[in-house]
């Protein structure tokens, strides 16, 4: 199996704490870089668990189209600003952050007070502007999840009239790009490939951790395929042999034996295979001579039946 290595050739942290990592993976066989790049990108963009603000409560506000006295931004603007906050919750439980700010003040993400389980990634991100003589009291709910969860899919438990729910974007990876380069020709003349993948996160996780987590998810997905076992579905019977499908007429039995079997609803060899020699003798007007005749006819096509019902 071809051995390859992974090198991180670039790592940047932006002003909003977003992180960018660039990795080189190779050498790979032709076609493997595309397979690897597409698989990693799919998991990175939609399969990683992340944290997001899912609801906001503002004192004195019970709908998203309201305005707040003494606050420059309207409620919709504040909800959008909260939606864009990057947070990292280390628990699967609902976490609540609160702030009370008296103007004049620029209300920022760092003003939110959370438990030790939640980290605000970009504390300088603006939430609202409060004028002198006014105040803003705000509460945000933080949850963990995967992918994108629109408002209409929220649990009905969170249905308080003053709790403004927002679309939750749990994806910690903002962007993934990859390119494929050809590397040196290997022995035998085959060209190798190298995957260059760029991962941009919101800062709640590092590109290194995001890449490792996506790889682990792919391993878990494919691992069961390495030990595939065939399980016969219940109720399925094996395909009948060609001999068992031979009609009774083709056994060339005597008229007496043939008529007795037909009256007993025996129409083919497969029907006869359910009989033992003793069963044949119990058919009305069917003697040992007729039974022996049937046994011989079956043996000519390679089929035998037991002498008694208990024979194996």
From Swiss-Prot:
The keyword Transmembrane helix belongs to this UniProt entry's keyword annotation: no
GO molecular function, one term: DNA-directed RNA polymerase activity
Catalytic activity: RNA(n) + a ribonucleoside 5'-triphosphate = RNA(n+1) + diphosphate
Record keyword Transcription present: yes
InterPro entries named in the record: DNA-dir_RNA_pol_insert, DNA-dir_RNA_pol_RpoA/D/Rpb3, DNA-dir_RpoA, RBP11-like, RNAP_asu_C, RNApol_insert_sf
Enzyme Commission numbers on file: 2.7.7.6
Gene3D superfamilies on file: 5' to 3' exonuclease, C-terminal subdomain (1.10.150.20), DNA-directed RNA polymerase, insert domain (2.170.120.12), RNA polymerase, RBP11-like subunit (3.30.1360.10)
SMART domains: RPOLD
Renumbered residue ranges of the record's region Alpha C-terminal domain (alpha-CTD): 236-312
Keyword line: DNA-directed RNA polymerase, Nucleotidyltransferase, Transcription, Transferase
Gene Ontology biological process terms in this record: DNA-templated transcription
NCBIfam families associated with the record: PRK05182.2-2, PRK05182.2-5, rpoA
UniProt similarity note: Belongs to the RNA polymerase alpha chain family.
General function of this protein: DNA-dependent RNA polymerase catalyzes the transcription of DNA into RNA using the four ribonucleoside triphosphates as substrates.
Domain notes: The N-terminal domain is essential for RNAP assembly and basal transcription, whereas the C-terminal domain is involved in interaction with transcriptional regulators and with upstream promoter elements.
Identification of the protein by name: DNA-directed RNA polymerase subunit alpha
Organism: Prochlorococcus marinus (strain MIT 9303)
């Amino acid at each position: 199996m071809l051995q390859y290595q992974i090198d991180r050739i670039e790592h940047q942290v932006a002003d909003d704490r977003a992180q960018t990592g660039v990795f080189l993976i190779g050498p790979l066989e032709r076609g493997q870089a595309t397979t690897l790049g597409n698989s990693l990108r799919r998991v990175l963009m939609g399969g990683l668990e992340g944290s997001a603000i899912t609801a906001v409560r503002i004192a004195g506000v019970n709908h998203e189209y309201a305005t707040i006295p003494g606050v420059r931004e309207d409620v919709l603007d504040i909800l959008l600003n909260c939606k864009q906050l990057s947070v990292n919750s280390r628990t699967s439980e609902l976490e609540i952050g609160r702030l009370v700010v008296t103007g004049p003040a620029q209300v920022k993400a760092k003003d939110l007070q959370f438990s030790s389980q939640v980290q605000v990634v970009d504390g300088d991100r603006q939430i609202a502007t409060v004028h002198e003589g006014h105040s803003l009291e705000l509460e945000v709910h933080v949850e963990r999840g995967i992918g994108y969860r629109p408002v209409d899919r929220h649990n009905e438990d969170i249905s308080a009239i003053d709790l403004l729910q927002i679309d939750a974007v749990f994806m910690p990876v903002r962007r993934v790009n990859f390119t494929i380069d050809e590397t040196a020709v290997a022995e035998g003349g085959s060209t190798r490939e190298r995957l260059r993948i760029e991962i941009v996160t919101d800062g709640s996780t590092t590109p290194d951790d995001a890449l490792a987590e996506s790889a682990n998810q792919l391993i878990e997905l494919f691992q069961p395929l390495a030990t595939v076992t065939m399980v016969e579905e219940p109720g399925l019977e094996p395909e009948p042999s060609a001999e068992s499908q031979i009609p009774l007429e083709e056994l060339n039995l005597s008229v007496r034996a043939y008529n007795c079997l037909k009256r007993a609803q025996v129409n083919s060899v497969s029907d006869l295979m359910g009989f033992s020699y003793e069963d044949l003798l119990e058919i009305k007007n069917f003697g040992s001579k007729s039974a022996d005749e049937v046994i011989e006819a079956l043996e000519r096509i390679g089929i035998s039946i037991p002498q008694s019902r208990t024979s194996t």
